[in-house]
Structure formats: C-alpha cells, structure tokens
Amino acid sequence: MDIEAYFERIGYKNSRNKLDLETLTDILEHQIRAVPFENLNMHCGQAMELGLEAIFDHIVRRNRGGWCLQVNQLLYWALTTIGFQTTMLGGYFYIPPVNKYSTGMVHLLLQVTIDGRNYIVDAGSGSSSQMWQPLELISGKDQPQVPCIFCLTEERGIWYLDQIRREQYITNKEFLNSHLLPKKKHQKIYLFTLEPRTIEDFESMNTYLQTSPTSSFITTSFCSLQTPEGVYCLVGFILTYRKFNYKDNTDLVEFKTLTEEEVEEVLRNIFKISLGRNLVPKPGDGSLTI
C-alpha cells in the first residue's frame, strides 16, 4: 500500500510533515469529498471486506467508497502512516425509528491526539451528520460547522455526539413527509467510549450487518458524498441534495426519483463510481436520514 496513492485518490497535495490540526482537518475534508460513504457492494451480490489490503484496493485503486468500518480504517492507516497519534474507538448509533442506540458496537471512529489535546475524527457518518472538521473532545461545548452545530457530552465515561440542525426547506412538496428527512432539530447521532479498539473487535459486527435480517444495511442501499456546499445522498432510487445554510439559517433540500438507468448515470457522474455489476436499489426503513 502506498500513502501517495491514497493522497492522489483524495486529491490531497498539501503538507504531510506538519502533524497539526490544520493538516488533520485538511486530510479529513479531502477524504469526505472524494470517498463516498456507501454500501453498494451488498446490493450487487458482493461482500463488504474488512481487511485493510482489500479496503485499499477497493477505495484507492478501484475508486469506490465504503461504510465506516472501511473508510475510517483507511483514514486510520493514513494518519498513523504519516505520524499522527491515532486510536480506534467503537460507537453505537442512534436509531430514530425505535428511539434508542444500537445494542451492538456498529461504528468505528477515531481519536487523534495533537499537542496533548484529543479530537474525534470520523469520515464515516455520511449524509448531513458527517463532520467536516475534527471535534475537540470537550463535554458540553457547541462546535459549529458548516453542516450543523455538533456537541459532545460526557456522562459517567460515555460520550454522546449530538447535532443541532437548521430548518430545512423542501423544494419537492411530495417529499415533505419522506422517511429520509430528519424529524428533529436536535438529533442524537451516536455514543462511544474512549476504550481503545482494534479492527478485530469489529469482525463479528461486519458479518452481522451483512447477514442479519434485522440489519438496516440489508434493506437500504445508500451512497453519500460531501461537496463544498452540501451533501448528495442516493438511497434506493431517491437522489437528494442538501445545500447547507442556503439562506436565513435554512438548508435547501432537493429530491428526485430516478429510473434504473439514471441511478447508474448518477453514480458515475456525481459519485464517480462504476460498479461493473447489477445494483438492486433498496429504499430502507427510515434508519438512515439525509
């Protein structure tokens, strides 16, 4: 695996030598705008691989994306390779339809330490809950970013990540009640602890998410990619674009229902993905919002 190939994949041409917050932020922003958050392999009859070599080949050489266990593992490798003090952590996503956090450790995120300060780094949340900059590990502090206001809160060793969203203006009125729209302005995202993890801790969950009838990833095909102004999301046959803060502290959200031919075209032109296999789009159950 070649770190320069990774940097070329994400379009990063800046410093590799300064292990500071600016460099960390720059790398994160480049990755989330180049590497889609997606699970399309599952809906093409292929597996979501967990091995680092396979992930590197999939994302860097084949120009694909992945879910958190893949994109954050790749980011972990890149950051440690250039010298950042980086730790894997495990998280539990909030599930809006059932109003509780997942019982299993379904999320991989990173902690990076710079000059004695700890930051949460995550390239694998997707949609409008994706951070654009690292979050300082401080409890109770609002941390405004372009997508929203993020806030970390610690209670008895458990950290909770929440977001405060803007109002949203939906251009297509037939989608006003779409299950893809977040319903609350204050939204829970996930919880985590600071216990260091290894990728082996996620092996059984990686299998479970692809095989269990209760896994929302089986019922949902998704692909999302951040842009300088917003985020594209493809869920099943529905393409959305959310432009953050387009006016008056309001996000603009556009919906479009695609045909099978248009799905392939959108993947190629917007997400820069060529699958090479037949995709079976699935609409999901409301666990994933845009």
Swiss-Prot record:
<feature type="binding site">
    <location>
        <position position="208"/>
    </location>
    <ligand>
        <name>CoA</name>
    </ligand>
</feature>
<feature type="binding site">
    <location>
        <position position="287"/>
    </location>
    <ligand>
        <name>CoA</name>
    </ligand>
</feature>
<dbReference type="InterPro" id="IPR053710">
    <property type="entry name" value="Arylamine_NAT_domain_sf"/>
</dbReference>
<dbReference type="GO" id="GO:0004060">
    <property type="term" value="F:arylamine N-acetyltransferase activity"/>
</dbReference>
<feature type="active site">
    <location>
        <position position="122"/>
    </location>
</feature>
<dbReference type="InterPro" id="IPR038765">
    <property type="entry name" value="Papain-like_cys_pep_sf"/>
</dbReference>
<feature type="binding site">
    <location>
        <position position="103"/>
    </location>
    <ligand>
        <name>CoA</name>
    </ligand>
</feature>
<dbReference type="Pfam" id="PF00797">
    <property type="entry name" value="Acetyltransf_2"/>
</dbReference>
<comment type="similarity">
    <text>Belongs to the arylamine N-acetyltransferase family.</text>
</comment>
<keyword id="KW-0012">Acyltransferase</keyword>
<protein>
    <recommendedName>
        <fullName>Arylamine N-acetyltransferase 2</fullName>
        <ecNumber>2.3.1.5</ecNumber>
        <ecNumber>2.3.1.118</ecNumber>
    </recommendedName>
</protein>
<feature type="binding site">
    <location>
        <position position="104"/>
    </location>
    <ligand>
        <name>CoA</name>
    </ligand>
</feature>
<dbReference type="GO" id="GO:0046990">
    <property type="term" value="F:N-hydroxyarylamine O-acetyltransferase activity"/>
</dbReference>
<keyword id="KW-0963">Cytoplasm</keyword>
<feature type="active site" description="Acyl-thioester intermediate">
    <location>
        <position position="68"/>
    </location>
</feature>
<dbReference type="GO" id="GO:0005829">
    <property type="term" value="C:cytosol"/>
</dbReference>
<comment type="function">
    <text>Catalyzes the N- or O-acetylation of various arylamine and heterocyclic amine substrates. Participates in the detoxification of a plethora of hydrazine and arylamine drugs, and is able to bioactivate several known carcinogens.</text>
</comment>
<keyword id="KW-0808">Transferase</keyword>
<feature type="binding site">
    <location>
        <position position="214"/>
    </location>
    <ligand>
        <name>CoA</name>
    </ligand>
</feature>
<dbReference type="InterPro" id="IPR001447">
    <property type="entry name" value="Arylamine_N-AcTrfase"/>
</dbReference>
<feature type="active site">
    <location>
        <position position="107"/>
    </location>
</feature>
<dbReference type="GO" id="GO:0006805">
    <property type="term" value="P:xenobiotic metabolic process"/>
</dbReference>
<feature type="binding site">
    <location>
        <begin position="106"/>
        <end position="107"/>
    </location>
    <ligand>
        <name>substrate</name>
    </ligand>
</feature>
